[in-house]
Amino acid sequence: MSTADRNQAGIYWQSRMGNNADGIGGNCHRYDIVTTDAQGQPVRGRLVVDYGIKIHNGGGAYDCSFPSPEALFARRGQPDPAHAPDALLLTHSHEDHLGALKHAIDMGYRLPPIHCAPFTAELVRKSLTSAGIIETDRRPEIHIVKPNETIMAGGAEVTFVPVDHLPGASALVIRTKEAAVFHSGDYKFDKTMALGDRADPELLRRIGKQGIDMVVSDSTAAGEERPKVSEREIGKHLQTIVAGQQGRAVVAGVLGTQLDRVVSLGRAAKASGRTLVVSGASLVQNIAAAERAGHSLEKAIGAPILLTKDARDLPADRALVVTTGAFAQPMAGLTRSADHQPGALYIGRDTTVIIPQRAIPPVAEAHRQMVERLDATGARVITAERAEEMGYGAIHQSGHAIASDTRLLYTLLKPRQVASPIHGAPGQIEANAEIARSVGIKPLVLRDNGAVVRVTSHGVDIVGREDLPRIGARETGDVKQLPRAKPGEGRRPRPPAIYRYDQLDSTGERIQSRNIEPYAGPARTPRPPRDLRVR
Protein backbone atom coordinates (compact mmCIF):
# COMPACT_ATOMS: atom_id res chain seq x y z
CA MET A 1 0.00 0.00 0.00
CA SER A 2 1.33 3.43 -0.91
CA THR A 3 1.16 6.56 1.21
CA ALA A 4 -1.48 7.85 -1.23
CA ASP A 5 -3.91 5.49 0.45
CA ARG A 6 -3.50 7.49 3.66
CA ASN A 7 -4.34 10.94 2.30
CA GLN A 8 -7.68 11.45 4.01
CA ALA A 9 -7.77 12.84 7.53
CA GLY A 10 -7.93 10.33 10.34
CA ILE A 11 -5.87 7.93 12.40
CA TYR A 12 -4.64 4.90 10.45
CA TRP A 13 -3.81 1.86 12.58
CA GLN A 14 -2.02 -1.30 11.53
CA SER A 15 -0.98 -4.30 13.62
CA ARG A 16 2.49 -5.16 12.29
CA MET A 17 2.78 -8.28 14.46
CA GLY A 18 1.08 -9.62 17.57
CA ASN A 19 -2.16 -11.03 16.15
CA ASN A 20 -0.38 -14.24 15.23
CA ALA A 21 -1.89 -17.61 14.42
CA ASP A 22 1.27 -19.22 15.84
CA GLY A 23 1.08 -17.55 19.26
CA ILE A 24 1.55 -14.23 21.00
CA GLY A 25 4.69 -12.16 20.55
CA GLY A 26 6.49 -9.62 18.40
CA ASN A 27 3.96 -6.96 19.34
CA CYS A 28 4.21 -3.86 17.16
CA HIS A 29 1.71 -1.33 15.84
CA ARG A 30 1.94 1.52 13.38
CA TYR A 31 -0.24 4.61 13.66
CA ASP A 32 -0.31 7.12 10.81
CA ILE A 33 -1.72 10.49 11.82
CA VAL A 34 -3.23 12.51 8.97
CA THR A 35 -4.58 15.99 9.63
CA THR A 36 -5.13 18.98 7.33
CA ASP A 37 -3.48 22.38 7.31
CA ALA A 38 -5.14 25.76 6.77
CA GLN A 39 -5.14 25.15 3.01
CA GLY A 40 -6.79 21.77 3.39
CA GLN A 41 -3.61 19.86 2.49
CA PRO A 42 -2.76 16.64 4.33
CA VAL A 43 -0.17 16.80 7.11
CA ARG A 44 1.24 13.41 8.07
CA GLY A 45 2.86 12.02 11.17
CA ARG A 46 3.73 8.48 12.16
CA LEU A 47 4.00 6.66 15.47
CA VAL A 48 5.25 3.15 16.21
CA VAL A 49 3.88 1.54 19.38
CA ASP A 50 6.09 -1.21 20.83
CA TYR A 51 8.65 -3.31 18.99
CA GLY A 52 8.94 -6.74 20.54
CA ILE A 53 10.14 -10.24 19.82
CA LYS A 54 8.33 -13.55 19.62
CA ILE A 55 10.34 -16.20 21.48
CA HIS A 56 10.75 -19.52 19.66
CA ASN A 57 11.07 -22.60 21.84
CA GLY A 58 11.74 -26.21 21.05
CA GLY A 59 14.84 -26.24 18.86
CA GLY A 60 13.43 -24.59 15.74
CA ALA A 61 15.39 -22.69 13.14
CA TYR A 62 15.30 -19.38 15.06
CA ASP A 63 15.69 -18.11 18.60
CA CYS A 64 13.12 -15.38 18.04
CA SER A 65 11.32 -13.43 15.35
CA PHE A 66 10.06 -9.86 15.08
CA PRO A 67 8.46 -7.46 12.58
CA SER A 68 10.71 -6.43 9.72
CA PRO A 69 12.14 -2.97 10.45
CA GLU A 70 12.40 -2.10 6.76
CA ALA A 71 9.08 -0.25 6.47
CA LEU A 72 9.26 1.16 9.99
CA PHE A 73 12.66 2.77 10.53
CA ALA A 74 15.44 4.56 8.65
CA ARG A 75 18.81 2.94 7.96
CA ARG A 76 21.88 4.49 9.52
CA GLY A 77 23.82 6.71 7.18
CA GLN A 78 20.93 7.13 4.78
CA PRO A 79 18.40 9.95 4.45
CA ASP A 80 15.14 9.48 6.26
CA PRO A 81 12.59 7.76 4.05
CA ALA A 82 9.34 9.52 3.34
CA HIS A 83 7.24 9.68 6.48
CA ALA A 84 9.77 8.09 8.85
CA PRO A 85 8.25 7.64 12.32
CA ASP A 86 8.26 10.67 14.57
CA ALA A 87 8.35 8.61 17.76
CA LEU A 88 8.46 5.10 19.18
CA LEU A 89 6.07 4.73 22.11
CA LEU A 90 6.63 1.85 24.54
CA THR A 91 3.76 0.63 26.69
CA HIS A 92 5.96 -1.39 29.06
CA SER A 93 9.19 -3.33 29.46
CA HIS A 94 8.45 -6.95 28.59
CA GLU A 95 10.53 -8.50 25.82
CA ASP A 96 7.53 -9.13 23.60
CA HIS A 97 7.08 -5.34 23.51
CA LEU A 98 10.66 -4.00 23.36
CA GLY A 99 12.98 -6.94 22.71
CA ALA A 100 13.41 -6.21 18.99
CA LEU A 101 14.98 -2.78 19.53
CA LYS A 102 18.50 -4.20 19.81
CA HIS A 103 18.02 -6.34 16.72
CA ALA A 104 16.87 -3.43 14.56
CA ILE A 105 19.95 -1.46 15.62
CA ASP A 106 22.24 -4.41 14.88
CA MET A 107 20.63 -4.71 11.44
CA GLY A 108 21.74 -1.15 10.74
CA TYR A 109 18.55 0.78 11.47
CA ARG A 110 18.27 4.06 13.36
CA LEU A 111 15.44 4.24 15.86
CA PRO A 112 13.31 7.36 16.35
CA PRO A 113 13.08 9.01 19.77
CA ILE A 114 11.58 6.66 22.35
CA HIS A 115 8.93 7.86 24.81
CA CYS A 116 8.20 5.68 27.83
CA ALA A 117 7.92 5.45 31.62
CA PRO A 118 11.07 5.56 33.80
CA PHE A 119 11.25 1.82 34.54
CA THR A 120 10.70 0.98 30.88
CA ALA A 121 13.54 3.35 29.99
CA GLU A 122 15.83 1.61 32.47
CA LEU A 123 15.16 -1.78 30.89
CA VAL A 124 15.63 -0.39 27.37
CA ARG A 125 19.08 0.84 28.40
CA LYS A 126 19.83 -2.52 30.02
CA SER A 127 18.73 -4.39 26.89
CA LEU A 128 20.89 -2.30 24.58
CA THR A 129 23.93 -2.46 26.84
CA SER A 130 23.68 -6.24 27.26
CA ALA A 131 23.55 -6.48 23.44
CA GLY A 132 26.81 -4.52 23.18
CA ILE A 133 25.13 -1.41 21.76
CA ILE A 134 27.24 1.07 23.69
CA GLU A 135 28.06 3.69 21.04
CA THR A 136 26.09 6.88 21.68
CA ASP A 137 25.37 7.45 18.00
CA ARG A 138 23.67 4.03 17.73
CA ARG A 139 21.46 4.39 20.78
CA PRO A 140 18.12 6.19 20.42
CA GLU A 141 17.07 9.24 22.37
CA ILE A 142 14.89 8.26 25.33
CA HIS A 143 12.34 10.70 26.70
CA ILE A 144 10.79 9.97 30.09
CA VAL A 145 7.01 10.33 30.34
CA LYS A 146 5.31 10.70 33.72
CA PRO A 147 2.04 8.94 34.61
CA ASN A 148 -0.94 10.66 32.96
CA GLU A 149 1.37 13.03 31.07
CA THR A 150 0.32 14.13 27.58
CA ILE A 151 2.94 14.66 24.89
CA MET A 152 2.72 15.84 21.29
CA ALA A 153 4.06 13.24 18.87
CA GLY A 154 3.48 12.80 15.16
CA GLY A 155 0.74 15.41 15.08
CA ALA A 156 -1.30 13.74 17.85
CA GLU A 157 -1.79 14.24 21.55
CA VAL A 158 -0.65 11.07 23.31
CA THR A 159 -1.47 10.48 26.97
CA PHE A 160 0.29 7.74 28.95
CA VAL A 161 -2.36 6.28 31.28
CA PRO A 162 -1.20 3.98 34.13
CA VAL A 163 -2.47 0.40 34.00
CA ASP A 164 -1.90 -2.60 36.26
CA HIS A 165 0.66 -4.98 34.79
CA LEU A 166 4.19 -4.15 35.97
CA PRO A 167 5.90 -0.90 37.05
CA GLY A 168 5.43 1.84 34.47
CA ALA A 169 2.94 -0.05 32.31
CA SER A 170 0.83 2.42 30.34
CA ALA A 171 -2.13 2.49 28.02
CA LEU A 172 -2.02 5.18 25.33
CA VAL A 173 -4.73 7.63 24.35
CA ILE A 174 -3.92 8.86 20.83
CA ARG A 175 -6.09 11.86 20.03
CA THR A 176 -6.43 14.27 17.10
CA LYS A 177 -9.25 16.58 16.07
CA GLU A 178 -10.40 13.80 13.73
CA ALA A 179 -10.43 10.77 16.03
CA ALA A 180 -9.30 9.17 19.28
CA VAL A 181 -7.91 5.68 19.89
CA PHE A 182 -7.31 3.96 23.24
CA HIS A 183 -4.43 1.45 22.95
CA SER A 184 -4.49 -0.68 26.09
CA GLY A 185 -1.07 -2.32 26.02
CA ASP A 186 -0.93 -5.21 28.50
CA TYR A 187 -3.25 -4.52 31.42
CA LYS A 188 -5.53 -5.83 34.13
CA PHE A 189 -7.25 -4.29 37.16
CA ASP A 190 -5.62 -4.93 40.55
CA LYS A 191 -5.41 -2.02 42.98
CA THR A 192 -3.41 -4.13 45.49
CA MET A 193 -0.21 -4.30 43.42
CA ALA A 194 2.60 -2.60 45.34
CA LEU A 195 4.79 -0.93 42.73
CA GLY A 196 3.97 2.01 40.49
CA ASP A 197 0.77 3.91 39.82
CA ARG A 198 -2.49 1.99 39.77
CA ALA A 199 -5.17 2.00 37.10
CA ASP A 200 -7.91 4.48 37.96
CA PRO A 201 -11.38 3.38 36.80
CA GLU A 202 -12.80 6.87 37.30
CA LEU A 203 -10.06 8.36 35.13
CA LEU A 204 -10.84 5.78 32.44
CA ARG A 205 -14.52 6.70 32.68
CA ARG A 206 -13.62 10.38 32.13
CA ILE A 207 -11.45 9.44 29.15
CA GLY A 208 -14.41 7.60 27.70
CA LYS A 209 -16.68 10.59 28.22
CA GLN A 210 -14.19 12.78 26.33
CA GLY A 211 -14.80 10.50 23.36
CA ILE A 212 -12.99 7.37 22.21
CA ASP A 213 -13.67 6.04 18.72
CA MET A 214 -11.77 2.76 18.91
CA VAL A 215 -10.35 0.66 21.73
CA VAL A 216 -7.42 -1.59 20.78
CA SER A 217 -7.17 -4.06 23.64
CA ASP A 218 -5.19 -6.98 25.08
CA SER A 219 -6.79 -10.40 24.46
CA THR A 220 -4.31 -12.71 26.22
CA ALA A 221 -6.56 -13.83 29.07
CA ALA A 222 -9.93 -12.52 27.85
CA GLY A 223 -11.32 -16.05 27.70
CA GLU A 224 -10.67 -16.73 31.41
CA GLU A 225 -13.95 -16.59 33.35
CA ARG A 226 -12.51 -17.86 36.66
CA PRO A 227 -12.75 -15.58 39.73
CA LYS A 228 -9.93 -13.06 39.84
CA VAL A 229 -7.31 -13.27 42.59
CA SER A 230 -5.59 -10.06 43.70
CA GLU A 231 -1.89 -9.73 44.45
CA ARG A 232 -2.81 -9.12 48.10
CA GLU A 233 -4.61 -12.49 48.24
CA ILE A 234 -1.66 -14.18 46.54
CA GLY A 235 0.60 -12.62 49.17
CA LYS A 236 -1.52 -14.05 51.99
CA HIS A 237 -1.41 -17.52 50.45
CA LEU A 238 2.37 -17.27 50.06
CA GLN A 239 2.64 -16.26 53.73
CA THR A 240 0.76 -19.42 54.70
CA ILE A 241 3.05 -21.57 52.58
CA VAL A 242 6.26 -20.00 53.89
CA ALA A 243 5.07 -20.15 57.51
CA GLY A 244 4.73 -23.92 57.17
CA GLN A 245 8.34 -24.49 56.11
CA GLN A 246 10.04 -24.33 59.53
CA GLY A 247 13.54 -25.73 59.48
CA ARG A 248 13.68 -25.83 55.69
CA ALA A 249 15.37 -23.72 53.04
CA VAL A 250 12.89 -21.93 50.77
CA VAL A 251 13.66 -21.02 47.14
CA ALA A 252 11.17 -19.27 44.87
CA GLY A 253 11.40 -18.98 41.09
CA VAL A 254 9.85 -15.94 39.39
CA LEU A 255 10.08 -14.07 36.12
CA GLY A 256 12.80 -11.44 36.05
CA THR A 257 10.35 -8.55 35.66
CA GLN A 258 7.71 -9.96 38.03
CA LEU A 259 8.68 -7.50 40.74
CA ASP A 260 5.28 -7.23 42.42
CA ARG A 261 5.48 -10.98 43.07
CA VAL A 262 8.95 -10.45 44.55
CA VAL A 263 7.36 -7.93 46.93
CA SER A 264 4.72 -10.50 47.92
CA LEU A 265 7.45 -13.08 48.56
CA GLY A 266 9.42 -10.51 50.57
CA ARG A 267 6.41 -9.79 52.75
CA ALA A 268 5.88 -13.52 53.26
CA ALA A 269 9.52 -13.86 54.29
CA LYS A 270 9.22 -10.98 56.75
CA ALA A 271 6.06 -12.44 58.30
CA SER A 272 7.94 -15.70 59.01
CA GLY A 273 11.09 -14.07 60.35
CA ARG A 274 13.05 -14.76 57.18
CA THR A 275 15.17 -12.40 55.09
CA LEU A 276 14.59 -12.06 51.35
CA VAL A 277 17.75 -12.95 49.41
CA VAL A 278 17.97 -12.26 45.68
CA SER A 279 20.03 -14.56 43.45
CA GLY A 280 20.82 -13.99 39.79
CA ALA A 281 22.28 -11.06 37.89
CA SER A 282 19.18 -10.29 35.83
CA LEU A 283 16.85 -10.09 38.81
CA VAL A 284 19.35 -8.03 40.81
CA GLN A 285 19.70 -5.62 37.89
CA ASN A 286 15.93 -5.30 37.48
CA ILE A 287 15.44 -4.53 41.17
CA ALA A 288 18.16 -1.88 40.94
CA ALA A 289 16.50 -0.47 37.80
CA ALA A 290 13.19 -0.26 39.63
CA GLU A 291 14.89 1.59 42.48
CA ARG A 292 16.36 4.13 40.06
CA ALA A 293 12.92 4.57 38.51
CA GLY A 294 11.39 5.35 41.89
CA HIS A 295 9.97 1.92 42.76
CA SER A 296 11.64 0.70 45.97
CA LEU A 297 11.03 -2.96 46.69
CA GLU A 298 12.61 -2.68 50.14
CA LYS A 299 10.20 0.13 51.03
CA ALA A 300 7.23 -1.88 49.73
CA ILE A 301 8.32 -4.95 51.72
CA GLY A 302 9.29 -3.02 54.83
CA ALA A 303 12.53 -4.97 55.21
CA PRO A 304 15.97 -5.12 53.58
CA ILE A 305 16.81 -7.30 50.59
CA LEU A 306 20.15 -9.10 50.61
CA LEU A 307 22.29 -10.33 47.75
CA THR A 308 23.65 -13.86 48.01
CA LYS A 309 27.17 -12.55 48.64
CA ASP A 310 25.89 -10.68 51.70
CA ALA A 311 23.90 -13.62 53.07
CA ARG A 312 26.64 -16.23 53.45
CA ASP A 313 26.28 -16.35 57.24
CA LEU A 314 22.48 -16.42 57.18
CA PRO A 315 21.09 -19.84 58.17
CA ALA A 316 19.24 -21.46 55.28
CA ASP A 317 16.03 -21.74 57.30
CA ARG A 318 16.09 -17.99 58.01
CA ALA A 319 16.18 -16.98 54.35
CA LEU A 320 13.80 -16.98 51.41
CA VAL A 321 15.86 -16.99 48.24
CA VAL A 322 14.19 -15.69 45.10
CA THR A 323 15.69 -16.36 41.69
CA THR A 324 14.60 -16.48 38.06
CA GLY A 325 13.29 -19.50 36.18
CA ALA A 326 9.51 -19.61 36.48
CA PHE A 327 9.37 -20.32 32.74
CA ALA A 328 12.30 -22.78 32.83
CA GLN A 329 14.52 -20.50 30.77
CA PRO A 330 17.80 -22.34 30.02
CA MET A 331 20.16 -19.99 31.90
CA ALA A 332 17.77 -18.97 34.69
CA GLY A 333 18.61 -19.74 38.31
CA LEU A 334 15.94 -22.34 39.00
CA THR A 335 16.68 -24.21 35.78
CA ARG A 336 20.39 -24.29 36.60
CA SER A 337 19.63 -25.61 40.06
CA ALA A 338 17.40 -28.35 38.65
CA ASP A 339 20.27 -29.33 36.34
CA HIS A 340 22.86 -29.25 39.18
CA GLN A 341 25.01 -26.80 37.23
CA PRO A 342 28.20 -25.51 38.88
CA GLY A 343 27.59 -22.39 40.94
CA ALA A 344 23.81 -22.83 40.99
CA LEU A 345 21.77 -22.67 44.16
CA TYR A 346 21.71 -26.00 45.98
CA ILE A 347 18.30 -27.65 46.13
CA GLY A 348 17.84 -30.89 48.07
CA ARG A 349 15.54 -32.82 50.39
CA ASP A 350 15.52 -30.03 52.98
CA THR A 351 14.43 -27.40 50.43
CA THR A 352 10.98 -26.14 49.54
CA VAL A 353 10.69 -24.72 46.03
CA ILE A 354 7.83 -22.33 45.26
CA ILE A 355 6.94 -21.46 41.66
CA PRO A 356 4.18 -18.82 41.87
CA GLN A 357 3.62 -18.65 38.12
CA ARG A 358 1.64 -20.85 35.74
CA ALA A 359 3.48 -21.98 32.62
CA ILE A 360 2.30 -20.53 29.32
CA PRO A 361 1.91 -22.81 26.26
CA PRO A 362 5.27 -22.06 24.57
CA VAL A 363 7.21 -23.14 27.69
CA ALA A 364 4.82 -25.74 29.12
CA GLU A 365 6.95 -28.75 28.20
CA ALA A 366 10.21 -27.19 29.42
CA HIS A 367 8.45 -26.19 32.65
CA ARG A 368 7.12 -29.72 33.17
CA GLN A 369 10.57 -31.22 32.68
CA MET A 370 12.16 -28.72 35.09
CA VAL A 371 9.59 -29.55 37.77
CA GLU A 372 10.29 -33.26 37.29
CA ARG A 373 14.02 -32.65 37.79
CA LEU A 374 13.31 -30.59 40.91
CA ASP A 375 11.08 -33.37 42.23
CA ALA A 376 13.93 -35.81 41.64
CA THR A 377 16.15 -33.85 44.06
CA GLY A 378 13.76 -34.76 46.86
CA ALA A 379 12.72 -31.14 47.33
CA ARG A 380 9.16 -30.16 48.23
CA VAL A 381 8.02 -28.44 45.02
CA ILE A 382 4.92 -26.24 45.18
CA THR A 383 3.80 -25.02 41.77
CA ALA A 384 0.80 -22.77 41.20
CA GLU A 385 -1.30 -25.82 40.33
CA ARG A 386 -0.12 -27.84 43.34
CA ALA A 387 -0.73 -24.93 45.73
CA GLU A 388 -4.43 -25.02 44.92
CA GLU A 389 -4.55 -28.83 45.13
CA MET A 390 -2.86 -28.67 48.55
CA GLY A 391 -5.43 -26.17 49.83
CA TYR A 392 -3.18 -23.12 50.03
CA GLY A 393 -5.17 -21.18 47.44
CA ALA A 394 -4.02 -19.37 44.33
CA ILE A 395 -0.43 -18.13 44.16
CA HIS A 396 -0.67 -16.95 40.56
CA GLN A 397 -2.94 -14.66 38.60
CA SER A 398 -2.46 -13.71 34.98
CA GLY A 399 -0.86 -10.34 34.39
CA HIS A 400 -3.42 -9.79 31.66
CA ALA A 401 -7.07 -8.80 31.68
CA ILE A 402 -9.39 -11.74 32.26
CA ALA A 403 -13.00 -11.63 31.09
CA SER A 404 -14.23 -9.45 33.98
CA ASP A 405 -11.41 -6.94 33.45
CA THR A 406 -12.07 -6.78 29.71
CA ARG A 407 -15.76 -6.19 30.35
CA LEU A 408 -14.94 -3.43 32.85
CA LEU A 409 -12.61 -1.63 30.43
CA TYR A 410 -15.23 -1.58 27.69
CA THR A 411 -17.92 -0.45 30.13
CA LEU A 412 -15.75 2.44 31.34
CA LEU A 413 -14.56 3.64 27.94
CA LYS A 414 -17.73 3.04 25.88
CA PRO A 415 -16.05 3.50 22.47
CA ARG A 416 -18.25 5.27 19.93
CA GLN A 417 -17.26 3.03 17.03
CA VAL A 418 -15.52 -0.29 17.66
CA ALA A 419 -13.25 -2.38 19.85
CA SER A 420 -10.46 -4.27 18.10
CA PRO A 421 -8.86 -7.15 20.03
CA ILE A 422 -5.08 -7.60 19.75
CA HIS A 423 -2.27 -9.51 21.47
CA GLY A 424 -3.70 -12.95 21.00
CA ALA A 425 -4.14 -16.03 18.88
CA PRO A 426 -7.46 -16.31 16.99
CA GLY A 427 -9.32 -17.99 19.86
CA GLN A 428 -8.25 -15.35 22.37
CA ILE A 429 -9.18 -12.56 19.97
CA GLU A 430 -12.64 -14.04 19.44
CA ALA A 431 -13.18 -14.32 23.21
CA ASN A 432 -12.35 -10.62 23.55
CA ALA A 433 -14.69 -9.78 20.67
CA GLU A 434 -17.55 -11.71 22.27
CA ILE A 435 -17.18 -9.66 25.45
CA ALA A 436 -17.39 -6.46 23.39
CA ARG A 437 -20.59 -7.72 21.78
CA SER A 438 -22.04 -8.58 25.19
CA VAL A 439 -21.78 -4.95 26.32
CA GLY A 440 -23.12 -3.51 23.07
CA ILE A 441 -19.83 -2.61 21.38
CA LYS A 442 -19.17 -3.62 17.79
CA PRO A 443 -15.94 -5.64 17.51
CA LEU A 444 -13.49 -5.28 14.65
CA VAL A 445 -11.96 -8.75 14.53
CA LEU A 446 -8.57 -9.03 12.81
CA ARG A 447 -7.24 -12.56 13.20
CA ASP A 448 -3.92 -11.73 11.58
CA ASN A 449 -1.65 -8.76 10.93
CA GLY A 450 -1.46 -6.29 8.05
CA ALA A 451 -4.90 -4.69 7.75
CA VAL A 452 -4.85 -0.88 7.54
CA VAL A 453 -7.73 0.60 9.52
CA ARG A 454 -8.87 4.21 9.14
CA VAL A 455 -10.45 5.69 12.26
CA THR A 456 -12.49 8.90 12.30
CA SER A 457 -15.26 10.24 14.49
CA HIS A 458 -17.68 9.16 11.74
CA GLY A 459 -16.62 5.56 11.30
CA VAL A 460 -13.95 2.88 11.22
CA ASP A 461 -13.06 1.13 7.97
CA ILE A 462 -10.47 -1.32 6.67
CA VAL A 463 -8.93 0.58 3.75
CA GLY A 464 -6.22 -1.86 2.67
CA ARG A 465 -3.97 -4.73 3.60
CA GLU A 466 -0.25 -5.49 3.40
CA ASP A 467 1.77 -8.68 3.65
CA LEU A 468 4.21 -7.94 6.46
CA PRO A 469 7.44 -9.93 6.54
CA ARG A 470 9.05 -11.04 9.77
CA ILE A 471 12.71 -11.37 10.62
CA GLY A 472 13.96 -14.64 12.07
CA ALA A 473 17.01 -14.31 14.35
CA ARG A 474 19.41 -17.03 15.47
CA GLU A 475 22.70 -16.85 17.34
CA THR A 476 25.69 -17.63 15.12
CA GLY A 477 28.02 -18.79 17.89
CA ASP A 478 30.26 -15.75 17.44
CA VAL A 479 30.33 -12.84 19.87
CA LYS A 480 30.95 -9.12 19.52
CA GLN A 481 34.31 -7.60 20.25
CA LEU A 482 33.71 -4.58 22.49
CA PRO A 483 36.20 -1.80 23.20
CA ARG A 484 37.60 -1.54 26.70
CA ALA A 485 35.51 0.48 29.11
CA LYS A 486 36.69 4.01 29.75
CA PRO A 487 37.29 5.17 33.33
CA GLY A 488 33.98 5.68 35.09
CA GLU A 489 31.97 3.61 32.59
CA GLY A 490 31.87 0.50 34.73
CA ARG A 491 32.37 -3.07 33.54
CA ARG A 492 31.42 -4.10 30.05
CA PRO A 493 28.74 -6.79 29.68
CA ARG A 494 29.68 -10.33 28.78
CA PRO A 495 30.54 -10.49 25.07
CA PRO A 496 27.13 -10.32 23.38
CA ALA A 497 26.05 -12.83 20.77
CA ILE A 498 26.04 -12.06 17.07
CA TYR A 499 22.84 -13.05 15.30
CA ARG A 500 22.04 -14.22 11.81
CA TYR A 501 18.93 -12.63 10.33
CA ASP A 502 16.63 -14.09 7.66
CA GLN A 503 13.57 -12.43 6.20
CA LEU A 504 10.47 -14.61 6.55
CA ASP A 505 6.95 -14.31 5.19
CA SER A 506 4.10 -12.93 7.28
CA THR A 507 3.42 -16.33 8.86
CA GLY A 508 7.05 -16.95 9.74
CA GLU A 509 6.96 -20.25 7.85
CA ARG A 510 8.82 -19.44 4.61
CA ILE A 511 12.22 -17.85 4.09
CA GLN A 512 12.20 -14.96 1.63
CA SER A 513 15.87 -13.99 1.91
CA ARG A 514 18.78 -15.33 3.95
CA ASN A 515 21.61 -13.78 5.92
CA ILE A 516 20.59 -10.14 5.99
CA GLU A 517 23.83 -8.36 6.76
CA PRO A 518 23.82 -7.16 10.38
CA TYR A 519 25.92 -4.46 11.97
CA ALA A 520 27.81 -6.29 14.70
CA GLY A 521 31.42 -5.11 14.67
CA PRO A 522 34.34 -7.54 14.54
CA ALA A 523 33.76 -11.01 15.94
CA ARG A 524 36.02 -13.14 18.07
CA THR A 525 36.06 -16.77 19.08
CA PRO A 526 33.34 -17.44 21.66
CA ARG A 527 34.33 -18.32 25.18
CA PRO A 528 32.36 -20.17 27.84
CA PRO A 529 29.92 -17.87 29.65
CA ARG A 530 31.15 -16.51 32.96
CA ASP A 531 29.27 -17.92 35.92
CA LEU A 532 27.39 -14.98 37.44
CA ARG A 533 25.83 -16.99 40.23
CA VAL A 534 27.26 -16.98 43.73
CA ARG A 535 27.42 -20.26 45.58
Pin down the residues of each PLM region:
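Ser/Thr- (and often Asn-) enriched beta-sheet segments in non-cytosolic proteins
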Residues: 42-44, 141-143, 150-152, 157-159, ...
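His/Asp/Glu-rich metal-coordinating catalytic cores
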Residues: 2-89, 94-271, 275-309, 336-341, ...
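Generic N-terminal simple sequence motifs
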Residues: 38, 522-525
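Extended hydrophobic/Leu-rich segments
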Residues: 11-13, 33-35, 72, 468, ...
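Non-Sec secretion/translocation targeting segments of pathogen effectors
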Residues: 524-535
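Hard-cation-handling environments
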Residues: 223-361, 368-392, 398-521
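Intrinsically disordered, low-complexity segments
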Residues: 1-2, 511
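Histidine-centered active-site/metal-ligand motif
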Residues: 92-97, 165, 183, 392-403, ...
